[in-house]
Design a protein with these regions (language model features):
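N-terminal capping segments
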Residues: 1-75, 191-193
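Generic low-complexity segments that are intrinsically disordered, proline-rich and/or Lys/Arg-biased
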Residues: 26, 33-36, 81, 93, ...
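Alpha-helix initiation/capping motif
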Residues: 38-39, 61, 88, 93, ...
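...with weaker cross-activation on analogous glycine-rich loops/strands in unrelated enzymes
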Residues: 6, 75-153
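Extended, compositionally biased low-complexity polar/Lys-Gly-rich tracts
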Residues: 41-48, 95-115, 163-190
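Aromatic- and glycine-rich peptidoglycan recognition patches
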Residues: 4, 123-193
Length: 193
């Protein structure tokens, strides 16, 4: 498996969940643009994030990103042992995950498609995460969980109620500052592929 294959897999998996909106804060979702409820998709999302270990009610941006990597790894037929290595390093907490990857010299300053973007809100322990889908100049396109379509405050920008596309500055914006990027190449090193 190459880093490009993994990147494509991560983006493909994350794209499946775009448009889900919270119907219960940080715990249940539905796509308002599809008929009926999206129970099968929501159950899959919850299952992928629970492995992180994420619990309903918790902020889920990093658990969403971790779950999308998990789904991509499974689709590329990695071993359970390799998946355990990924899960031992990535957590549902952005700042902790950044520290884990930095300690291993695997947190990059450069974004590439398929990377997980990790940011910190000011000097707090609160953070935000997203999956990079494209990079252009000083900006990146992302797919993010737990974000807002129209952020009216820093808090709503990092903890909204959608899984959707966003455009962000690579360095962050407002008090949301980029900590670094977990690239597909870093993920492959973690799992020993």
């Amino acid at each position: 498996m190459t880093s490009d294959q993994l990147a494509q897999g991560i983006i493909r998996q994350a794209s499946r969940f775009i448009g889900l909106r919270e119907v219960k804060p940080n715990a249940d979702w539905d796509n308002p643009n599809t008929p009926g409820n999206d129970r099968a998709l929501v159950d899959e999302l919850r299952s992928l994030m629970r492995q992180s270990p994420w619990e309903p009610g918790w902020a889920y941006c990093a658990a969403f990103a971790e779950g999308m990597v998990l789904a991509a790894l499974r689709s590329l037929a990695v071993t359970p042992e390799q998946i355990k290595r990924w899960q031992a390093t990535m957590t549902p907490h952005c700042v902790t995950s950044a520290a884990n990857f930095r300690t291993l010299s695997l947190l990059s300053e450069n974004a590439v498609p398929g990377s997980i973007w990790l940011a910190r809100h000011g000097s707090t322990s609160n953070g935000h995460a997203g999956i990079v889908t494209a990079v252009r100049g000083v900006s990146m396109a992302t797919i993010e969980g737990n974000t807002s379509l129209d952020p009216s405050s820093d808090a709503k920008e990092r903890e909204g109620d959608w899984i959707t596309h966003r455009i962000r500055f690579l360095k962050g914006s407002g008090t949301l500052n980029t900590l670094g990027f977990i690239t597909p190449a870093s993920i492959l090193k973690i799992i020993g592929a």
